[in-house]
Design a protein with these regions (language model features):
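Active-site neighborhood for divalent-cation/phosphate handling
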Residues: 78, 82-166
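Phosphate/pyrophosphate-binding loops at sites that engage ATP/ADP/AMP, CoA/4′-phosphopantetheine
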Residues: 65-78, 162
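Conserved NTP-handling cores and scaffolds of large molecular machines
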Residues: 29-32, 69-72, 116-120
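N-terminal phosphate-binding loop and adjacent alpha-helix
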Residues: 39-70
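Charged, flexible boundary elements
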Residues: 1-4, 164-166
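Switch/connector loops and helix/strand junctions flanking conserved nucleotide-binding motifs
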Residues: 35, 51-53, 88-92
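Short, glycine- and charge-enriched coil/turn segments that flank and shape catalytic ligand pockets
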Residues: 33, 51-60, 131-139
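Gly/Thr-rich phosphate-binding beta-strand-loop-beta motif of the actin/hexokinase/Hsp70
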Residues: 2-44, 73, 77-84
Length: 166
């Protein structure tokens, strides 16, 4: 599923929170086992640019984000953020553990069609196997996460405008 810092990387990364009142960034480096916070910055979100967890005015958010980047020491190439609010759905389902990866992924997609209240062509979908189900060890608990693609595209647009890789 989503990985904040890959185990083998020492590449500095920005973690960014696009909030309705402020945009915050924290610069981290290291690995998943041993990381450090190098710096952080915060700037006011342009009024009305983010409402109900959604970027309403990508251009104004992008300009504010560029100002925030100038407040941080150093240059960064990678960024990560989270999406939240009503555009994100998470569900846990169970899938048989004795099937191959391709069948497993197909079953997860069929489960997602039943569980996610949005058309699947409008969402970005990911899943993570949580492990054996407590009551039925022959099945795995699987966390399915779906976010409206438009929500993700807006954040990616802000990062791309600042030459950052998501």
């Amino acid at each position: 599923m989503f990985r904040f810092i890959k185990k083998s990387t020492n590449t500095p990364m920005l973690g960014v929170d696009f909030g309705s009142s402020t945009i915050k960034a924290v610069a981290v480096s290291g690995s998943a086992e041993s990381f450090s916070i190098d710096s952080w910055a915060e700037i006011a979100t342009p009024k009305g640019a983010i409402r109900d967890f959604q970027l309403q005015d990508v251009d104004r958010v992008s300009q504010a984000f560029k100002q925030l980047l100038r407040m941080l020491p150093g240059k960064y190439k990678n960024a990560a953020t989270a999406v939240n609010g009503s555009s994100v759905i998470t569900k846990i389902t169970q899938v048989a553990s004795n099937i191959n990866q391709i069948d497993f992924e197909n079953i997860v997609m069929m489960e997602a069609e039943q569980l996610i209240p949005f058309p699947l062509d409008e969402v970005s979908l990911d899943f993570e196997v949580l492990g054996p189900n407590i009551t039925d060890p022959a099945r795995n608990d699987v966390l399915i996460c779906a976010a409206r693609s438009q929500s993700i595209a807006s954040a990616i647009s802000v990062f791309n405008d600042s030459d950052l890789t998501v």
